[in-house]
Amino acid sequence: MNEAEKISNLDEPRLFEEDGIEARVAALVIPLLKPLGFRLVRVKLLGQNGLTLQIMVERADGSLTVEDCETVSRTVSPLLDVENVIERKYHLEISSPGIDRPLVRKSDFFHWQGHLAKIETKITIDGRRKFRGTLTNITQDGFILNADKAAYGEAMYTSISFCDIIGAHLVLTDELIRDALKKNKDLSQQFIPEDNPTDSIQTLNFKK
């Protein structure tokens, strides 16, 4: 069993959490997801189509189907209505992480080692807080980011601790698309080459 398999499960904590209303929503839905075999990726309020509450979820293996989205919606929607966390009309969006997914758990970094990612840190490292590069040398404490386009004077390799990250996501590349489709059969069935690959995210929208 490799490092990714050891920690890739429904109980694995996320590296960072939401604030404000998003945090309240997360606290409500997380206990509902685990018994169904899902885990939360993130909660985000978006100012599109009026107001959209995006709840991004996945199974422990990273998969999610349209039927899964429907199941999650039927489960969390009644509680959100009762708690009235958002005191105005909104659209509820249940979605999968997609190909250029957020990296929110250590297992995500192990799973996608060797791929390009964007990282934001809460502390300044080598004079910066935003980085772009290839994920390498993943450990339980952090990783090394190999810069793909280092500017003059910038380090080619940056060591980053997991405890210092406030945001991370994969960068869409041809290599990532090929790898993602190999790993996720559900994703390969959704993927339409002519469209933007980010459209391969499974999404269901509901008016509230």
From Swiss-Prot:
Predominant location category: cytoplasm
The keyword Cytoplasm is annotated on this UniProt entry: yes
A Pfam family that the UniProt record links to this protein: DUF150_C
Membrane-spanning residues: none
CDD domains, alphabetized: YlxS_C
Compartments in which it is found: Cytoplasm
InterPro entries linked to this entry: Ribosome_maturation_RimP (IPR003728), RimP_C (IPR028998), RimP_C_sf (IPR036847), RimP_N (IPR028989), RimP_N_sf (IPR035956)
Keyword entries, A-Z: Cytoplasm, Ribosome biogenesis
One GO BP annotation of this record: translation
GO cellular component, one term: cytosol
Keyword Cytoplasm: yes
Family per similarity comment: Belongs to the RimP family.
Physiological role: Required for maturation of 30S ribosomal subunits.
Descriptive protein name: Ribosome maturation factor RimP
